């Protein structure tokens, strides 16, 4: 069984850290999402890391023309503090824009466009895309 390295982003002191995990190849978007939701790696690579994502995340992800549309339920945004909301969005955007064929992400809640916080704290307008660069200011370092 072949596996491939996948970059997943987790939180350390309100900053994001890239970790690499092996996922069965070819890694699908749903496999990447499941790995991200499962939480940081065990052992030294995951030491001090956490996830802002809920352990149960109802999300559908469709990729078209380089844009990943992540459609979730209202609970995804309402159950998180404002800081964790920004970090959870950053985890998703940074992780998925590292995948081949994805350059931007757009968020919807119950199929309606929503504003999401960017890394600097400002809001991306409903229906506008966000990218890796919108959250790169939150990245602290590369972990193994």
Regions found by a protein language model. Give the residues of each.
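Bimodal "functional hotspot" detector
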Residues: 1-144
């Amino acid at each position: 069984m072949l596996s491939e390295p996948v970059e997943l982003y987790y939180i350390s002191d309100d900053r994001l850290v890239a970790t690499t995990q092996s996922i069965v190849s070819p890694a699908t978007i749903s496999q990447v999402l499941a790995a991200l939701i499962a939480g940081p790696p065990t052992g030294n690579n995951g030491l001090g890391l956490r996830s802002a994502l809920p352990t149960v995340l109802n999300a559908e992800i469709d990729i078209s023309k380089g844009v990943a549309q992540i459609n979730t339920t209202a609970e995804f945004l309402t159950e998180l503090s404002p800081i964790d909301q920004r970090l959870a969005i950053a985890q998703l955007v940074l992780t998925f824009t590292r995948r081949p064929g994805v350059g931007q992400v757009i968020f919807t809640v119950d199929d309606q466009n929503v504003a999401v916080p960017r890394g600097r704290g400002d809001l991306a307008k409903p229906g506008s895309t966000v990218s890796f660069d919108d959250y790169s200011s939150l990245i602290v370092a590369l972990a193994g």
